[in-house]
Swiss-Prot record:
InterPro entries documented for this protein: Ribosomal_bL20, RIBOSOMAL_L20_CS, Ribosomal_protein_bL20_C
Protein's name according to its UniProt entry: Large ribosomal subunit protein bL20
UniProt entry tagged with the keyword RNA-binding: yes
UniProt xrefs under Pfam families: Ribosomal_L20 (PF00453)
Amino acid sequence: MPRVKGGYVARRRRKKVLKLAKGYYGSKHTLFKSAQGQVMKSLQYAYRDRRQKKRDFRKLWITRINAAARLNGLSYSRLMHGLKLAEINVNRKMLADLAVNDEKAFAQLADKAKESLNS
């Protein structure tokens, strides 16, 4: 029996890896072996960073809310506690958006939080 080198199946597999490696620098987008290693690493980075992105955005929202809260004479934690006491359920993403785009509305929320903290 003649030896079979893989042919069609192997070519398809290599082509798939090289397609994923498109845009990489140097030999990493032309040579299969180095492309395969880089593609594997890239997929690991993508997996990790899809989870990291959620944490990064939450940090950003909290930073923005804290800055706006301090302009209104409250700390972040006191603002959030005051809103909870006032039974105002607004998530951090929306609060951060208000802090950046609608300062008057955010100031009203901060006043409500202050009132509920004092009572």
